[in-house]
Amino acid sequence: MLIVGPPGAGKGTQASRITSGYGIPDISTGDIFRANIKNKTELGQQVKAIVDAGDYVPDSLTNELVTGRLAEDDAKGGFLLDGYPRTLEQVKYLDELLGSDGEKLDAVIQLVADREEIVARLTKRAREQGRADDSEEAIRYRQEVYVRETSPLIEVYRERGLLVEVDGLGPVDEVAGRICTALAERGILPLTGTGESVA
């Protein structure tokens, strides 16, 4: 499965709910990058040099790191990808990678949230936490980048019938319940097997 959603929609929180409820690992490209940098792997050193230069990590390197992570034992029974794929080239690569093992994606969970409500939420949080760098302008810019980058991917998965759109606003438990219900409608049940909310 994949999870996508705009910054501030609670993607990280819901990803951890999904992974604990369904017994699958949450595989975040950001976490993979940080772990490789921390462990000073060869790929991690390449990522660090690129990030330090202010550039985006190229698809080829990201693909290589994701391939390595998906080959680990805990991902054999399923996984939730967060932050990948980000480009159409990565979508193609992931298709080929999963296809080579006779696997395919079961669902792409999209947390849908009103942009103005997210901007208000993040602006308030930045103010409360004294994060001056998180101006409303910066928050709006990140929202625009998200829409620009992910719209083509979302359309690909919508056309394939994999997209599961869920209202991402509201209490954490309610959103988790919506996700669980939407997945159950596709025959994807949590470890409890009841199709009920995974709290």
From Swiss-Prot:
<dbReference type="InterPro" id="IPR000850">
    <property type="entry name" value="Adenylat/UMP-CMP_kin"/>
</dbReference>
<comment type="similarity">
    <text>Belongs to the adenylate kinase family.</text>
</comment>
<feature type="region of interest" description="NMP">
    <location>
        <begin position="28"/>
        <end position="57"/>
    </location>
</feature>
<keyword id="KW-0808">Transferase</keyword>
<keyword id="KW-0545">Nucleotide biosynthesis</keyword>
<dbReference type="InterPro" id="IPR033690">
    <property type="entry name" value="Adenylat_kinase_CS"/>
</dbReference>
<comment type="subunit">
    <text>Monomer.</text>
</comment>
<feature type="region of interest" description="LID">
    <location>
        <begin position="124"/>
        <end position="134"/>
    </location>
</feature>
<feature type="binding site">
    <location>
        <position position="125"/>
    </location>
    <ligand>
        <name>ATP</name>
    </ligand>
</feature>
<feature type="binding site">
    <location>
        <begin position="55"/>
        <end position="57"/>
    </location>
    <ligand>
        <name>AMP</name>
    </ligand>
</feature>
<feature type="binding site">
    <location>
        <position position="131"/>
    </location>
    <ligand>
        <name>AMP</name>
    </ligand>
</feature>
<keyword id="KW-0067">ATP-binding</keyword>
<protein>
    <recommendedName>
        <fullName>Adenylate kinase</fullName>
        <ecNumber>2.7.4.3</ecNumber>
    </recommendedName>
</protein>
<feature type="binding site">
    <location>
        <position position="170"/>
    </location>
    <ligand>
        <name>ATP</name>
    </ligand>
</feature>
<dbReference type="GO" id="GO:0004017">
    <property type="term" value="F:adenylate kinase activity"/>
</dbReference>
<dbReference type="GO" id="GO:0044209">
    <property type="term" value="P:AMP salvage"/>
</dbReference>
<feature type="binding site">
    <location>
        <position position="90"/>
    </location>
    <ligand>
        <name>AMP</name>
    </ligand>
</feature>
<comment type="pathway">
    <text>Purine metabolism; AMP biosynthesis via salvage pathway; AMP from ADP: step 1/1.</text>
</comment>
<dbReference type="GO" id="GO:0005524">
    <property type="term" value="F:ATP binding"/>
</dbReference>
<keyword id="KW-0418">Kinase</keyword>
<dbReference type="InterPro" id="IPR027417">
    <property type="entry name" value="P-loop_NTPase"/>
</dbReference>
<feature type="binding site">
    <location>
        <position position="142"/>
    </location>
    <ligand>
        <name>AMP</name>
    </ligand>
</feature>
<keyword id="KW-0547">Nucleotide-binding</keyword>
<keyword id="KW-0963">Cytoplasm</keyword>
<dbReference type="Pfam" id="PF00406">
    <property type="entry name" value="ADK"/>
</dbReference>
<feature type="binding site">
    <location>
        <begin position="83"/>
        <end position="86"/>
    </location>
    <ligand>
        <name>AMP</name>
    </ligand>
</feature>
<feature type="binding site">
    <location>
        <begin position="8"/>
        <end position="13"/>
    </location>
    <ligand>
        <name>ATP</name>
    </ligand>
</feature>
<feature type="binding site">
    <location>
        <position position="34"/>
    </location>
    <ligand>
        <name>AMP</name>
    </ligand>
</feature>
<comment type="function">
    <text>Catalyzes the reversible transfer of the terminal phosphate group between ATP and AMP. Plays an important role in cellular energy homeostasis and in adenine nucleotide metabolism.</text>
</comment>
<dbReference type="GO" id="GO:0005737">
    <property type="term" value="C:cytoplasm"/>
</dbReference>
<feature type="binding site">
    <location>
        <position position="29"/>
    </location>
    <ligand>
        <name>AMP</name>
    </ligand>
</feature>
